Amino acid sequence: MIKKLGGFKMEILRIEHLSKVYGSGDTAVKALNDVSFSVEKGEFVAIIGPSGSGKSTLLHMLGGVDRPTSGKVLVDNTDIYNLDETQLAIFRRRQIGLIYQFYNLIPVLNVEENITLPLLLDGHKVDKKQFDEIIKILNLEKRLNHLPNQLSGGQQQRVSIGRALINNPAIMLADEPTGNLDSKNSSEIVDLLKMFNKTFNQTLIIITHDERIALQADRIIAIEDGEIKKDEVVRS
């Protein structure tokens, strides 16, 4: 069952002096430059910035997908880049729920198999009560045997959300989750993410170029030229 939490605040994520440089010498490109901030458990943070600002690079490093050139990423007090590749892959699968713009579903697996894949890769049994709760909230009960190509874009993104949630991750990271959807489906997906954030205290960090989405977050971090230009709480 998805845990409903409340009460005192606690730090779930800390980024310390994070930098990322691609290439070397005259061709070196600094994608991130000395970025530091922390996120509390249950916080909804929107990261915004123009194309090429470094926001997607930052998200990939928060999710353990791309190693920084320097600096630290601590998730629930674990410095994830002190882990070796095998340990990092396991940590990412168990503690980070990733949601992508283009869904990244396995085309030969049906809805149920895509959602439960992180558990099966870990050799864990599916908690039927939790699974049923997730698919009910996502309105996927009648789509469990469908393959991704039999679903609409909005339905595929719901599957992606279910997969991200199935392990009760410490953090959900969403990279432009509405970028491939029409306005109706975009609104529904954002409402679902907000519901999981508020009802179940699920920490949510979302990359978006859509100001309307960003303004629904608790906090907005603006990145430009690889640096934080603004970090403000818009609601508490």
Predicted region positions:
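H-loop (His-switch) and adjacent beta-strand-loop-beta switch element
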Residues: 220-232
